[in-house]
Structure formats: structure tokens, C-alpha cells
């Protein structure tokens, strides 16, 4: 870890505990900062808060003490990425011209290990996991490691102390995190895709959302690389105007891109066949595109075809992202709880050749599901719907001509009904197309319950 003086003896307010708040607090203490941590939740019985308190961090919880800015001067406010900029503490800090930063920028600025960054509306976690797997295989030959960090669930500040210049950080960045960075310079940055109707409750407009994503490349220069989706032409134009890095592209079908999906192989435009598609374990065209991004990043960071082939042929998928759960009575069952929007379901549903029994539904964000009608018509034989959006999804299913439409209240009810509708040789796919918050705290919790309910089928 680099010993920088930026935060030494600085008075810093951390807003929000959570995983990243806890980790960045410990990092900042080692960098010599004086810390106050505030969380709207009561932290009086929180073990992490108690640990920080023993280390000398002042803890203020249960409310936001906006008046604290009138009593003392802060040099920085470190904001949990999920806290909106309309938060009164953030608004007050900005009004006083106090820099508002986030954990990734602090951690990456002290990292001795080089780093690459990946963002996107869908597919970024799988891409990060694939890249980490390829690069770990490559770096291990010389005693190094690749670490998957960031929005994937492991704070960067948790890893930077042990990561050396022999290692690599593969960083997943959300739009929330990117909005709070001003000076990160990844050797390779990649945007997997950008779709509308994602996080507009936070960013307010699609244009704001795109601009947040583009911050991943804003500090890159001609010595760096930017990986862009050749098929999203409207986004590509903005990316090319924004970046100063060398650009490489990937495409589902266009052979003029640097990397593309061929008939039997993932290929590069120099007619090089990199990976046999039939050897890739994770299903779906979208996952083949994720593989292309991981290949592009890894090639630039020194990996060879053998590293790529080993990693892609042994990777069975990220949890809650078209995750294979089990085969039960000749039905293959998949958990795609990360399908929190229509676009995610759009890429999941066409991933299988077998007839599908689909389970969908969740939080109503005011979207219509008519765009799913052609996919329902082509791939879905039966559908079980639950949650706030069940009737809206049922309308789309009727338009698609699906005869077996079952409406229930909860996911627990949906699972056995889906099994009853299925036959040997079918796929049972849980791809909600909606956020989880009507019945679950997170998509991870929702996916865990789905797997639990599936396993309960075997006991009945």
C-alpha cells in the first residue's frame, strides 16, 4: 500500500457504515486521518461501530446531525455510494465546498497493485469474475493474484493493504460509485452495456446515468485502454468523444469489432479463434459477450489463450446470475434473481433451447412489459407470476398467447406451481424482471430464498 499524505491529520466525516464505510474507516485511520462516522440507523448495538469506536472513531448514529458543520470544519465527506446527493448532510457539505468522495477513489489511490475497472447495466459482475479467474491463473505463475473487488461485494479498501505490484485488482464499479470519483485511472476500463430504465430513481435522467458510467474513463490517457460495446452505437459515439484512451471493441455479430462471437468460437478480428463456444459453461449469448470483455481486458494485461481457455471452461456462473441450481426430475433449474429490470430478463430468457417455465415479478416501478412479449411467445411455455407486477406481467403473457398463466402472491407459492407446470426436459427459470424490494431486502436475499424453496421441493 502506498503511504500517501493526502489524508494525514485531516478531519473526515464518513456518511454511512455498511461494508465499505467500515473498511474505508480502518484504511483512513492507517493513513492518519481523524474520523467521525455518521449513520441514520442506530448503531448502539453494532459490532463494527463498537470496533471503530475503540480505534478512536467518533460515532454519531440514529439521525443526521446537519448542525455539526456549523461547529467544526471537515476536510472531506466520504459518502456511501447508495446515499443520494439530496441527503441533507451531503447537500450541506457541497454548499460549504467540502469535497464529497467515495471509498473506491481513496482505496485505488493508495493501491500498489495495478487495477482495471468494469461497469455496465447488466453483466458487470460476471465479467469481473471471469476476468479475475483468467488473470489469477495467469499471475499465479509468478506468485501473483487477481482480486475481484468493488461493487461485487468486497470493498477495495479491504484488499489494498495486502495487494502488491505483482497482483491485479479487478474492480466492479456501479454508477453510484462512479458518480463519486474524480480521479481514478484504470489501465483498462470497460463498459459492458448501458440500458435505459436503470437506477433512474437515483440519477433522475438517462443522460445523467450515462454520464456517471462514462466517468470510468474520464481520467484515462493514451497509455490506457477502453473497451466498448460495438453494438450500442448511440452509446459508442458518446464513449469515443469522452475517452482519451486507446479503444478496443466487442460485438455479438460484427466481425469488424476487435472481438466477436463467431459460429463456433469467440474470435478476434485477426482471424484468431480464442475459445470454443461449446466449452463455455455459462449459458446465453449475453454471457458470451461478457466473456469477450473479459478476454479483451485479460489480453491487454498479459494473459494468453491457455489462461482464457482454462478459466472460461471451468467457470459455472456468478451467484444469482443465471446460476445453475440443480436438475430435479429432469428439469434444469436456474436462479437469475439479479434480473432486477426488463433488460436483464431480455437477455436471460433466450439463453436456453429447452421449453421454459418462467417465474417473474417484483417491485412495481411503473414500467410496462410489452417488450417481453416476443420473447414470451418464442421461449416461454408457462409462466408463474407474483409480487406487485404480477398483473402487468400477466397482460404481457396473454398478449404472447401463453395459455398457462398462474398468479400467486409470494415467491414461496410460485416455486411449487412452476414445478407442477413443468415436464421432463424443461427449464425452470427464475428471472423476475423487477427489483426485489416489494418482498425482499435485496436481490441476493430473494435468490437465496428461491434456492431454499427449490430444495424444499425434494423433501415434499
From Swiss-Prot:
UniProt keyword annotations, A-Z: ATP-binding, Cell cycle, Cell division, Cell shape, Cell wall biogenesis/degradation, Cytoplasm, Ligase, Nucleotide-binding, Peptidoglycan synthesis
CC per GO annotation: cytoplasm
Chemical reaction(s) catalysed: UDP-N-acetyl-alpha-D-muramoyl-L-alanine + D-glutamate + ATP = UDP-N-acetyl-alpha-D-muramoyl-L-alanyl-D-glutamate + ADP + phosphate + H(+)
Pathway it works in: Cell wall biogenesis; peptidoglycan biosynthesis
Principal location: cytoplasm
Subcellular localization: Cytoplasm
The keyword Ligase is assigned to this record: yes
A biological process from GO: cell division
Record NCBIfam families: murD
Family affiliation: Belongs to the MurCDEF family.
Name recorded for this polypeptide: UDP-N-acetylmuramoylalanine--D-glutamate ligase
Gene from which this protein is expressed: murD
Amino acid at each position: 500500500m502506498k503511504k500517501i499524505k493526502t489524508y494525514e491529520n485531516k478531519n473526515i466525516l464518513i456518511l454511512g457504515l455498511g461494508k465499505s464505510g467500515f473498511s474505508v474507516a480502518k484504511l483512513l485511520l492507517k493513513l492518519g486521518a481523524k474520523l467521525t462516522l455518521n449513520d441514520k440507523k442506530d448503531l448502539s448495538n453494532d459490532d463494527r461501530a463498537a470496533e471503530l469506536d475503540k480505534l478512536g472513531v467518533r460515532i454519531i448514529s440514529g439521525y443526521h446531525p446537519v448542525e455539526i458543520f456549523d461547529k467544526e470544519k471537515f476536510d472531506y465527506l466520504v459518502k456511501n455510494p447508495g446515499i443520494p446527493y439530496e441527503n441533507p448532510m451531503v447537500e450541506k457539505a457541497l454548499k460549504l465546498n467540502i469535497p464529497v468522495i467515495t471509498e473506491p477513489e481513496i482505496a485505488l489511490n493508495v493501491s500498489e497493485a495495478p487495477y482495471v475497472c468494469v461497469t455496465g447495466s447488466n453483466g458487470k459482475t460476471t465479467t469481473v469474475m471471469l476476468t479475475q479467474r483468467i488473470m489469477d491463473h495467469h499471475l499465479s505463475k509468478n506468485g501473483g493474484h487477481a482480486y475481484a473487488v468493488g461493487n461485487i461485494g468486497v470493498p477495495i479498501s479491504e484488499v489494498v493493504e495486502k495487494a502488491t505490484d505483482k497482483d491485479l485488482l479487478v474492480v466492479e464499479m456501479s454508477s453510484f460509485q462512479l458518480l463519486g470519483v474524480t480521479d481514478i485511472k484504470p489501465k483498462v476500463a470497460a463498459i459492458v452495456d448501458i440500458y435505459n430504465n436503470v437506477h433512474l430513481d437515483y440519477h433522475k435522467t438517462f443522460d445523467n446515468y450515462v454520464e456517471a458510467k462514462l466517468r470510468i474513463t474520464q481520467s484515462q490517457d493514451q497509455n490506457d485502454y477502453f473497451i466498448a460495446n460495438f453494438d450500442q452505437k448511440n452509446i459508442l459515439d458518446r464513449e469515443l468523444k469522452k475517452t482519451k484512451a486507446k479503444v478496443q471493441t466487442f460485438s455479438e455479430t460484427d466481425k469488424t469489432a476487435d472481438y466477436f462471437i463467431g459460429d463456433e468460437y469467440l474470435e478476434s478480428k485477426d482471424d484468431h479463434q480464442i475459445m470454443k463456444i461449446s466449452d463455455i459453461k455459462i449459458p446465453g449469448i449475453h454471457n458470451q459477450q461478457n466473456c469477450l470483455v473479459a478476454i479483451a481486458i485479460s489480453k491487454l494485461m498479459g494473459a494468453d489463450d491457455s489462461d482464457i481457455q482454462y478459466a472460461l471452461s471451468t467457470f459455472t456462473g456468478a451467484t444469482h446470475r443465471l446460476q445453475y441450481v440443480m436438475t430435479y426430475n429432469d428439469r434444469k433449474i436456474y436462479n437469475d434473481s439479479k434480473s432486477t429490470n426488463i433488460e436483464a430478463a431480455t437477455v436471460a430468457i433466450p439463453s436456453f433451447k429447452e421449453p421454459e417455465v418462467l417465474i417473474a415479478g417484483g417491485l412495481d416501478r411503473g414500467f410496462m412489459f410489452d417488450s417481453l412479449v416476443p420473447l414470451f411467445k418464442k421461449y416461454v411455455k408457462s409462466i408463474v407470476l407474483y409480487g406487485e407486477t404480477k398483473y402487468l406481467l400477466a397482460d404481457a403473457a396473454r398478449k404472447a398467447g401463453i395459455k398457462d398463466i398462474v398468479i400467486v402472491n409470494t415467491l414461496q407459492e410460485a416455486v411449487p406451481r412452476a414445478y407442477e407446470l413443468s415436464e421432463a426436459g424443461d427449464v425452470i427459470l427464475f428471472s423476475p424482471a423487477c427489483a426485489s424490494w416489494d418482498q425482499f431486502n435485496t436481490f441476493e436475499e430473494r435468490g437465496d430464498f428461491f434456492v431454499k424453496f427449490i430444495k424444499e421441493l425434494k423433501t415434499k
